[in-house]
UniProtKB/Swiss-Prot annotation:
The gene is TMEM97. Signal peptide: none annotated. This is Sigma intracellular receptor 2. Keywords: Endoplasmic reticulum, Membrane, Nucleus, Transmembrane, Transmembrane helix. The EXPERA domain doesn't possess any sterol isomerase catalytic activity. The four transmembrane helices are all kinked owing to the presence of proline residues in each, creating a ligand-binding cavity near the center of the protein. One of its GO terms (cellular component) is endoplasmic reticulum. Residues 31-68, 121-141 are lumenal. It is a multi-pass membrane protein. Sigma-2 receptor which contributes to ameliorate dysfunctional cellular processes and slow degenerative progression by regulating cell functions including cholesterol biosynthesis/trafficking, membrane trafficking, autophagy, lipid membrane-bound protein trafficking, and receptor stabilization at the cell surface. Forms a ternary complex with PGRMC1 receptor and low density lipoprotein receptor/LDLR at the plasma membrane, which increases LDLR-mediated LDL cholesterol internalization. It is found in: Rough endoplasmic reticulum membrane; Nucleus membrane. Its main location: endoplasmic reticulum.
């Protein structure tokens, strides 16, 4: 596979990432900030199953800082997802470079406190989380495995946009 084939393969991967992120955001993530009545009982039950199965304290009892991240996901990221999916499925859209860099840096930045909380926070009954959350190191790693792709894929996107010669090259504009 040559450079063009590798680039197209990664563009398709990123296209699927952004396309898959739309239903995840709408149906699961935003339950933390949108009115409960917007969601049918089946989706609320699905989220509750996820919270119990993965012991996710951030969605069970979202702290204000986490709600602010969900709000940013609603206002800034969700509108970007279909645009990015289109650009990467179409391929060769150099105009996506700057928005993709902004998205990737923003997302990776939000994941640092999320991952730090899941790895280091006190989930005892005395904490903000009132005993909800992972109890063992294995449970923490299991939960982190859900969140870590949302750090790693934006990191791949960032490196792709910054280092790939195709996206890195600037078109020379003719002087009038």
């Amino acid at each position: 596979m040559g450079t063009l084939g590798a680039r197209r393969g990664l563009e398709w991967f990123l296209g699927f990432y952004f396309l898959s992120h739309i239903p995840i955001t709408l149906l699961m993530d935003l339950q933390g900030v949108l009115p409960r009545d917007l969601y049918p009982v089946e989706l609320r039950n699905l989220q509750q199953w996820y919270i119990e199965e993965f012991k996710d304290p951030l969605l069970q009892t979202p702290p204000a800082w986490f709600k602010s991240f969900l709000f940013c996901e609603l206002v800034f990221q969700l509108p970007f997802f279909p645009i990015a999916a289109y650009a990467f499925f179409k391929g060769g859209c150099k105009w996506i470079r700057t928005p993709a860099i902004i998205y990737s840096v923003h997302t990776m930045t939000t994941l640092i406190p999320i991952l730090s909380t899941l790895l280091l926070d006190d989930f005892s009954k005395a904490s903000h989380f009132r005993g909800q959350g992972p109890k063992t190191f294995q449970e923490r790693l299991f939960l982190i495995s859900v969140y870590i792709p949302y750090f790693l894929i934006p990191l791949i996107l960032l490196l792709f946009m910054v280092r790939n010669p195709y996206y890195k090259s600037e078109e020379k504009r003719k002087k009038k």
